């Protein structure tokens, strides 16, 4: 699919695909296909659950519960397996403001051109998450 997307489309959008898979598989594959087709570099949009929190363990448990279904769907399961992730909680971006900001920034190093955050957690955590994300614009 990435070869087809790179040769015919403007890019791809991922969900539940972690940074290692984005950097080692997704971005290089779609970019190489675009180059072979003489097309401009495609967009690589990554979407992941994000929570700024002081309680990382609880947030990861919550992510595992809220996003559990994605670990059971074959296409998402394949990306989680490629990442070495047991489930969605393992690819969720979770931590304090500095940790979350660093992990979001690192996605660009993996070849991501745009990021979509699915904020989760308590109202306070979602507010903190949105604040960090705004600071990265």
Language model features with spans:
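Active-site-adjacent structural elements that line small-molecule/cofactor binding pockets in enzymes
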Residues: 1-137
